Design a protein with these regions (language model features):
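Outer-membrane beta-barrel "beta-signal"
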Residues: 28, 326-332, 355-367
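The canonical Cys-X-X-Cys-His
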Residues: 27-36
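Detector for outer-membrane/organellar transmembrane beta-barrel domains
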Residues: 185, 207, 218-314, 322
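Sec/Tat signal peptide C-region and signal peptidase I cleavage site
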Residues: 9-17
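Sequence/structural signature of outer-membrane beta-barrel proteins
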Residues: 74-80, 109-113, 140-143, 195-203, ...
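Bacterial N-terminal signal peptides
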Residues: 2-10
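Outer membrane beta-barrel
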Residues: 37-42, 63-67, 71-75, 81-199, ...
């Protein structure tokens, strides 16, 4: 039985859209999102890829068009955790076009860490052809689109954000310090990047492991389409203060697809990977997929359902996780200065010999 618990106020955020861009361009959240869901429209996806800017953008001197914030509380019914209500997170957002070619973006969780921060260069040739390069703390735009950019509730697919293999903490949608280059030509968008790997979760191993990723997307209508993903990285297993450590050379591959219409979106992905660890045989393996359907019966509500199935295999055996999640999201209000929504989300997760009923209350107010 699924038990719905919770509510979420969220902002019109491209993958967490922020009111500063609604103020700057004097547009509704539905310009970039299938509001009240976070699903990106063709305009929103192109806005994200270009560097949080529209074609031909330049600097805007009004500081209210460059800065925004949101406050977030969360309650997890499965664990009974109330820490977020007692100590809310505050996020500072800043960015947009700085010059004819340069733009920037910052998402700083004041309570914890900088979640994203990068400077971006974009050179345009017409409406649907441009080159772009970024440097800073970032993640592939393909993962941002199918992760937060697909959100209708408060959670991301397991294979993108939660499932890890043995002691390697890598998940595809995490952010890392690095650089990447990309470009759009008509319906195609490609991106390649080099990142500092993590030897300790959340701590960049500068000058040691360098991770590499590449993506390729085809979106005939600007948003519906398919995408390919590849990541190769390294990780040192063991205690860095008590060598020797074991080198973990790993790779992940994936295929993504979605079909979007004004009233619904069907999306999914399959990812596979292996970890080759010195002295450990056979190779450790991870695979998983998800399918999600969003529905938009009116301008004030979005409903959705998602199924996740992941499997990890190592020398200790195999672990399979299956999860079903449902939700409904309601618009509370929407203005250029502040926006809010309420989302209800519930799920059931099954692992060998056990199951857990899930419910999350997530409250976000953006201004």
């Amino acid at each position: 039985v699924l038990f719905a618990v919770g509510g979420a106020f969220a902002l019109c955020l491209p993958s967490a859209a922020v009111p500063m861009w609604a103020r700057r361009y004097n547009v509704a959240c539905s310009t970039c999102h299938n509001w009240p869901a976070f699903q990106l429209t063709a305009v929103g996806l192109d806005f994200l890829r270009r560097g949080h800017r529209l074609k031909g953008d330049g600097f805007d001197k009004d500081w209210t068009h460059l800065v925004a914030g949101h406050v977030e509380w969360e309650y997890d019914a499965a664990t009974g955790s109330t820490n977020q209500f007692n100590s809310p997170e505050f996020h500072l957002h800043a960015g947009g076009a700085l010059t004819e070619n340069f733009s920037g973006y910052l998402n700083a969780n004041v309570n914890n860490e900088i979640e994203a921060a990068y400077l971006q260069y974009t050179k345009e040739w017409g409406d649907d052809t441009y080159f772009t390069a970024r440097g800073g703390r970032l993640s592939p735009t393909l993962l941002r689109n199918y992760g937060n950019g697909l959100e209708a509730g408060a959670s991301d697919p397991l294979i993108l954000s939660d499932t890890t293999l043995n002691a390697n903490p890598f998940t595809p949608d995490r952010t890392n310090n690095g650089i990447d280059v990309g470009g759009r030509y008509q319906m195609f968008f490609a991106q390649v990047g080099v990142l500092n790997g993590d030897d300790v979760a959340g701590q960049a191993s500068v000058g040691h492991h360098k991770d590499f990723y590449a993506t390729l997307e085809a979106t005939p209508d600007g948003v519906s389409g398919v995408g390919l993903y590849y990541h190769h990285g390294g990780y040192d297993l063991g205690d860095p203060t008590a060598p020797p450590q074991l080198a973990d050379s790993y790779h992940r591959e994936g295929v993504f697809a979605n079909y979007s219409q004004p009233l619904f979106r069907i999306a999914g992905a399959y990812l596979y990977g292996q970890d080759h660890v010195a002295t450990v045989t056979p190779d450790r393996k991870i695979q998983g997929w998800y399918a999600q359907v969003n529905g938009y019966p009116s301008g004030w509500v979005a409903v959705w359902v998602r199924y996740d199935d992941t499997k990890t295999t190592d020398e200790t055996g195999q672990l399979r996780t299956r999860q079903g999640t449902v939700g409904a999201t309601f618009k509370v209000f929407e203005m250029n200065t502040t926006s809010a929504r309420i989302a209800l989300e519930a799920g059931r997760q099954e692992m060998p010999g056990t199951h857990t009923n899930l419910g999350v209350a997530n409250l976000i107010w953006a201004f």
